[in-house]
Design a protein with these regions (language model features):
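A short, charged helix-loop
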Residues: 71-96, 189-194
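Glycine-rich, often acidic, oxyanion-interacting loops/wings at catalytic, nucleic-acid
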Residues: 101-238
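Single conserved hydrophobic/aromatic residue that forms the stacking wall/gate
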Residues: 1-12
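Phosphate-backbone recognition surface of nucleic-acid-processing proteins
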Residues: 163, 170, 239-243, 249-333, ...
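Short alpha-helix plus adjacent loop in nuclease-associated cores
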Residues: 35, 42-83, 151, 287-297
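Basic, amphipathic alpha-helical segments enriched in Lys/Arg and hydrophobic/aromatic residues
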Residues: 331-380
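Short glycine-rich phosphate-binding loop at a beta-alpha junction
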Residues: 15-26
Length: 380
């Protein structure tokens, strides 16, 4: 059908516009092919199509009904349709990596909870004895320890000097720091532990396979994180984003992946609406709610990253940072936790937009690389 449409003499490209919903990823190949063939292509937010022209009591959901609805939307908004332009390769790869990173992070959390639950049956409380962070290869001390010492009997069935020497060799073999106090803490925990399951081959398989699964997923997470930072460093706004407080080599590439090129947003309110942290006005007659909920109709991945950035402000409390000053003022006013956190995220996003717009304005030769994929006019 596409080949026939491109080669059709009846199709006047200057007067033909292709409008589609940008659902998932399967629309991108079609939109790119038609765009390269010279057609005007517009990818519309599915929510705008869903809420458009809902003037019937019947709920019909067929391909034909959806096509008619999209066509009516296109005719009514003909002058406001935005031409689709494919995203450049770096930003596209960065966004894809970020989505895989977020998925792997969820899987790592689930795998860690699963391993902790299994250890509560064979070695309860061992997780709290270690606080080492995840290394660049995805390994973590408590996970490797659980793989080798998967039951309390692996520790308490031998004298403390023998366990201490074995633990010292284990730390050297896995390149971990040996602490005598840590060995004493683990041995004391094993001595007083009350376990549900006895030492058996089944318990060994369960714990070790859960540990292997967690290590594998953690390694994937760290690979994604390093690759995202490498790709983000190729973008022109990388030094400006990384110079902002609360943004490091993990959160910076995530922000750049989800926001894209800020020049595609006409003003800062559009970026706030894109993130879904804009307040929804609630007024009817004499009712006028002053504390409104956020719309949450934007990218959930972007909102999660913003929340983590603001949590960094909350933990470090930089007194000279405008975002923290704004957050602290809202907290002093007695606002609830999520209210002042979202307000601070809104403030951070506006500063992000202003800094990058000023930076891009200083680069006269730099061209925009990716336009906004949705019609934001209705979201503002």
């Amino acid at each position: 059908i596409l080949i026939g449409l491109v080669g059709s003499e009846m199709c006047i490209r200057d007067r033909t516009r292709v409008v589609m919903e940008h659902t998932g990823r399967y629309y991108e190949a079609v939109a790119k092919a038609l765009h390269e063939a010279g057609f005007f292509v517009c990818a519309v937010n599915p929510l705008l199509i869903k809420e458009y022209g809902a003037n019937s009591l019947r709920r019909v959901k067929t391909d034909k009904a959806d096509a008619v609805k999209i066509a009516r939307y296109a005719l009514d908004n003909w002058a406001d349709l935005r031409d689709f332009t494919p995203m450049d390769a770096i930003r596209y790869d960065l966004k894809t990596l970020n989505r895989q990173f977020q998925l792997a992070s969820k899987q790592r959390t689930a795998s860690a909870n699963n391993l902790i639950a299994l250890l509560e049956q064979s070695f309860p409380g061992i997780r709290k004895c270690f606080d080492s962070p995840v290394r660049s290869d995805g390994t973590q001390k408590w996970v490797d320890f659980a793989h080798s010492f998967w039951h309390v009997d692996c520790v308490r069935k031998q004298p403390f000097p023998a366990f201490c020497e074995r633990y010292r060799k284990w730390c050297k073999r896995h390149a971990y720091l040996f602490k005598l106090s840590n060995a004493e803490e683990v041995y004391a925990l094993a001595k007083r532990a009350v376990v549900l399951t006895p030492k058996s081959k089944v318990v060994k398989v369960l714990v070790q396979e859960a540990a292997n699964q967690l290590i594998s997923i953690s390694r994937s997470v760290e690979v994604y994180r390093a690759e995202m930072d490498r790709l983000a460093a190729m973008l022109p706004e990388y030094p400006v984003v990384m110079a902002m407080y609360g943004v490091g080599k993990s959160y910076g590439p995530q922000l750049m992946a989800e926001i894209g090129d800020v020049r595609r947003f006409e003003r800062k309110q559009a970026l706030v609406a894109f993130a879904g942290i804009d307040p929804m006005p609630n007024q009817s007659g004499d009712k006028n709610v002053r504390s409104n909920k956020s719309s949450k109709r934007g990218s959930p991945y972007l909102r999660k990253t913003l929340f983590n950035v603001i949590r960094t402000y909350l933990q470090c409390a930089p007194q000279d940072e405008p975002v923290f000053q704004f957050l602290n003022r809202k907290r002093a006013e007695g606002k609830p936790f999520y209210v002042y956190m979202l307000a601070a995220a809104n403030k951070f996003l506006r500063r992000y937009y202003a800094k990058l717009r000023d930076y891009f304005a200083s680069l006269d030769t730099l061209q925009s690389v990716d336009p906004i994929p949705t019609t934001l006019k209705a979201s503002l």
